[in-house]
């Protein structure tokens, strides 16, 4: 948690002038090649070294016409949970509309509850600042290429159709716990081979990280926890492994 808080302070205090001059801004909404209709499922959550499950992810997706609603809830053995909902317009592109992010501690107490209105350019709700409730009513231009929660894997799955110089950039709303609008990039790192159930898999390797500008990025990337996706190519591509932090508190987790 201290690590993530230090990053937030660094971003706020040290980057203001640099970002305005040198930031690499995201482009238009990503082009959609792969997106399913109505699906649901559950996946065990493992610790960073594997072993016994420490929780479970529940996923629900419902599509009606050109609108899709995705809900992902991560429940942990200690009683804590992370919940993200996103509604987006999907036709030829992925255009975010609205959503909600909720983080609860092991006692079920809400630490973060944010509602995101992309067309209206508002983020409302509250977060806990070391036990003090802070109300949020943030007015910010949010373009349709603002993605969070379950929308991010949609970006990864459609990487090839949108990559420029092996990168795809977009904006996100990140609870730190205070909500911050960040530019993120998915970068292709090459291929990885793993063995699973006696089968050799050649997977595409991606990383997700914030980007502020070429001067600052090397410093930030050394500080932030690594978030990685291993994706099996196919029609559509499928997630073989996710490794990274569950939220701003930095607890590492693994999905396979």
Regions found by a protein language model. Give the residues of each.
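Residue-level recognition of conserved structural "scaffold" positions that shape functional pockets
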Residues: 21-23, 138, 155-156, 205
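Bacterial N-terminal signal peptides that target proteins for export
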Residues: 1-9
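Generic hydrophobic, helix-prone segments enriched in Leu/Val/Ile
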Residues: 16, 59-61, 96, 152-161, ...
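Acidic, serine/threonine-rich low-complexity disordered tracts
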Residues: 22-120, 166-256
């Amino acid at each position: 948690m201290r690590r993530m808080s230090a990053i937030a302070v660094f971003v706020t205090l040290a980057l203001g002038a640099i970002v305005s001059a040198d930031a690499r801004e995201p482009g238009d909404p990503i082009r959609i090649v792969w997106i399913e209709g109505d699906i649901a499922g559950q996946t065990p959550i493992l610790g960073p070294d594997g072993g016994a499950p420490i929780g479970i992810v529940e996923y629900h997706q419902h599509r009606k016409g050109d609108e899709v609603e995705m809900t992902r809830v991560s429940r942990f053995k200690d009683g804590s949970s992370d919940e993200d909902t996103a509604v987006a317009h999907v036709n030829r592109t992925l255009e975010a509309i609205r959503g909600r992010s909720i983080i609860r501690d092991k006692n079920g107490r809400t630490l973060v509850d944010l509602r995101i209105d992309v067309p209206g350019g508002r983020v409302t709700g509250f977060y806990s600042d070391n036990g003090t409730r802070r109300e949020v009513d943030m007015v910010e231009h949010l373009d349709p290429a603002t993605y969070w929660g379950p929308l991010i894997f949609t970006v990864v799955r459609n990487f090839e159709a949108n990559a420029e110089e092996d990168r795809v950039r977009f904006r996100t709303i990140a609870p730190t716990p205070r909500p911050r609008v960040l530019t993120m990039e998915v970068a292709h790192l090459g291929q990885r081979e793993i063995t699973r159930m006696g089968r050799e898999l050649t997977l595409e390797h991606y990383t997700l990280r914030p980007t502020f500008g070429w001067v600052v990025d090397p410093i930030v990337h050394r500080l932030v926890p690594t978030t990685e996706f291993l994706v099996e190519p196919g029609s559509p591509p499928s997630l073989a492994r996710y490794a990274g932090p569950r939220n701003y508190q930095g607890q590492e987790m693994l999905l396979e």
